[in-house]
């Protein structure tokens, strides 16, 4: 703060100094000079040194002689900036900027080139500065530049000899830069190479080679533009447009005062921002340490968990390996047992398959037999039915045949009679007259009589006895008819007997085959005698079959029981055979099952008890596992509190007591802090009063002094030495703050209008420029001063112990006050820190109480978990023992139950096992069944036949052999009957014609009557014939129908009988009995065998599956064993490798004291995925956090290798080390970054409060700014006037004088008026803490000048420009030219020579101004070299050149001119340059002249 105010004082008091004359010489100090220019390996100059004249050096020569190249070398050595160098007369026209070589590439030759300036400064030091140039290969024609300087070289050493090495008398080699360095250092001189142009120019400024320190590229640009303007002559628009930047010096005092004020405010605000940034950094560091801890600790705990998990996995793999081996052994034993059992089942299955196939074939045969039997029964029924129908039909046919024959006979007789009648009628009709008819009738009667005689064999037959004979024959016919009827009856009876006999005979033959008719009765009698027995046997067949089935079932059960017994003995490894042994063993097994069940129940109860205990312990373990992370977090928080507080807490009450003590301690520290704050404020007020630039303790005095046009007395005595300060302080007494004015009377008039002024205002009349203490009559005493105020008033003032009169006294007292303030501030900071620390500690304790107090003092959950886990493991071992015992008991119990099941199956079948006669009974029953089935088959085949035979069997006793004789008698009787009837008919005809015998006399009269009778008889007989014909036809049809039915029945009978015989033959060939239960028995047998086969197959399939499963399990077990072994070995290798890495991690963490940070036990309860997620999230945050820190970034990148977890620990150590290095040990008294972050937070909070208060004190008023700007502008206006006085005598051609015109811009004048006027309109800008003063003044400028477009510039940039007084001024150059008077200096209004002269004058003013500006920052014994250029001097006439020479002599300035050959100045040194070409070699021949005199 003191430095800022002192700088401001310097600024404000420069106005009181007289501005020096621009062309005044520096008395006592010689100006530095350029001695020579050396060009090495330039185009035309292999090694040439041009000695420079102290005034003017002229380069004379024709076009292309090398004048511009020489000047280019000089400029390049002076300003080696490729961005600025631009030699226009050699630049390729129309070339693009990318390929343009700026005219330098073509001036060089291939290889190493040099351009060096040999100078001697005001200290008589020889300095060689230069640049090494080298063409860069490529189409862009680039040039590489390296700057260097050489000091300590003797004056006798030629610069050319430094840069070359002489090979022989005519040859030399250019040295490289390294060779040059070695050569210079070997000679004892100092060689230095520069890596930046700024360093190069800084050296040149410090040693007095250039007039201004070129700090930036803009400074170099100004210098180059000045050189360029000098080189090409004329008025440079680039310079005249920005003449303020060249001529008006930066008011370093004012600017520095504003900058210091701004920088102080900015620094203060930046400090506040930095505090915020630091707080953000603190948050970042906190974030960094938190994320680093999360990143590394999560990986650390994950690796620890994985290591523990890997070890457990290795043990599990080994256990799995051993377990798989034991399972393989058991599997192999089981495989052998099951293979043996599978072989037995396979053999048994083959037997069962054969039996089942036999049963299936038997079932098929039975089914076929049953189907055949059904067909036989059906056919037997059909045949029996057909036989009956056939017999009936035969009788019907015979009856129909007899009717047919009788009808035929009647029809034939009627037909014969009709024929007779027709013949008679024909005969009668032939005789148309009666005689003829009578004669005919008579003749016919005679014929009939003759016929009757013939037929009857009666010779004596006559008309008279014809009746007798007729009656006799009728009686005979009746006798024959009776006989025929009798015979017919006998025939019927005989025919029936014959039919029954035949039928019975056929039935017997059907049963027993062909037998003689005589033996039929015996066969029938034997069949009928055995028929009831066979029928009874057939009826007993189902019972016998059921009995046989039952016996076979018992046999099967006996066989099953035998197999079951054998199986039982095999399984039980016993040899029990008798029922007593089995029952005894049964009792033993029952007792064993009861004992094992009771023992198993006890084990189950105990196991349940242990499981309940295990569940309780598991619940307790899980509860503590859930509680453990929070408890560990609480313990970590408790440890942090104990570390922060230095106390040990045994219970929660101790924590509460400590919090209460902290509150009391905080109140004490707060009271001390407030007292120190009060002391600091008092010291700040004193320092603020003493820090006023003019020594006034009241700012109103400055306003009044400016208003009255006076100067503060303290300002006039500001330079009083400190030893005189007590005297002058006592001399003026209360008037030490008086205002010195030129005229008291003028001031008196203004006193009445004063509103704001101190209570006591002292005014002293005098000249502020020549004021002394003669105005007072005083006498100095030992301890004070007596002042005669008036004739009647004396004032005695003691010498003050702490004088404040004068800047030196104030500064001394300020130093004391500031030291005291710093001490108070340090104590205040310490107390504030303590208060903050107490508050933070109390806050931490409050957080701990709210979050962790309930858990922190409970038992360690991990210890409880360890005890619980131990108990749980013991219970697990006991449970495993119980499970093993229970498994053994269950196996024994299952075996016993299985034996009991087998015994339960065996015991009911004990009687079967003891039944030895079962097989014999089955054989006996089977024989009876065979007989019964044979009888049943016989009855089934012939039962119907026998039942038909039984009622007619007696007919077989007598064979009806007389049937043929009776039939012959019957036929004979029929024949006799027919003959007798013929005779009767013949006699009847005679009897009927008896009357015709009388026609002998009356034939004529009776012919017609006879004819009618014959006709009626004929008609009657015809009708009878037709009736008989119809009856015959019907009888024939009926007979044919009956005969057809008979034929059909006979055909059906024959086919069905044949089929029946075939079926009986086939069923006989099948060889099975087709009884009612045969199918059921076959099916039951088949189903039983199928069930046994299915059971056997299921058992075999199950066993084969078990074998396949065991084989696959064996393969799986083999793979499992290999895998378990491989996994175990891999896991063991992994554990071994992880152990090595883990040992490295532990060693690093323990040696670096970070194990406690990394071993966060609460993370051990998170899963690997959660820890990996936590680590990955932290890694992502860390990548952002360390992005700007290369070391940490590389460490973090290395730590990402998961194969090397130790790199993460190294990264954590690097973070800790990095944060430790960032700890300021002067502020923070700790090495722990986490504690440092806490202390930093407290310290930053305190600094924020302090700096916020300081910002309010640093603010400067707008009125003060306006006053400072006005004073500075007034001073610079005076300096410009002094410059104009030095330019009045400069004349070039018609230009008689040159001057500078400076004016204040209207817009800026309005700004100054606003700053010093009413502040109510813009006070909001300067009271806004968010804006700097520069931004506030920029905003005010924009308000006052809204029409001005500020473009894209920020308010800060505009404000900084407004704090530079040069921006308030407009500066122009005017020339007085002939009759035109004062004109603005422009190239178009002046001739070439006038423009060059005017421009050169302006440049001289600029150089002089620069030297004056830099005088304060350059050594006092250094006056810089002063040299300008002028190319193409032919544009100046001889008078102008002489004027330039005179100007150079007056200003002690060197000038380098390039002129054509026709110009030869009389003064200075002239070099004639001639470019010569000899063969392929080109060089410039140089001849040096001083004036027109001798050649050097």
Swiss-Prot record:
The keyword 4Fe-4S does not apply. Residues 332-496, 537-608, 665-692, 806-832, 862-1066, 1101-1139, 1235-1290 form a coiled coil. Homodimerization via its hinge domain. Binds to DNA via its C-terminal region. Interacts, and probably forms a ternary complex, with MukE and MukF via its C-terminal region. The complex formation is stimulated by calcium or magnesium. Interacts with tubulin-related protein FtsZ. This is Chromosome partition protein MukB. It is found in: Cytoplasm, Nucleoid. GO terms for cellular component: cytoplasm; nucleoid. It comes from the Bacteria. Gene3D superfamilies: 1.20.58.850, 3.40.1140.10, MukB, hinge domain. Its main location: cytoplasm. Belongs to the SMC family. MukB subfamily. ATP binds at residues 61-68. Keywords: ATP-binding, Cell cycle, Cell division, Chromosome partition, Coiled coil, Cytoplasm, DNA condensation, DNA-binding, Nucleotide-binding. Plays a central role in chromosome condensation, segregation and cell cycle progression. Functions as a homodimer, which is essential for chromosome partition. Involved in negative DNA supercoiling in vivo, and by this means organize and compact chromosomes. May achieve or facilitate chromosome segregation by condensation DNA from both sides of a centrally located replisome during cell division. Transmembrane segments: none annotated. One of its GO terms (molecular function) is DNA binding. GO terms for biological process: cell division; chromosome condensation; chromosome segregation; DNA replication. Residues 693-810 are annotated as: Flexible hinge. It holds the Pfam family MukB. The hinge domain, which separates the large intramolecular coiled coil regions, allows the homodimerization, forming a V-shaped homodimer.
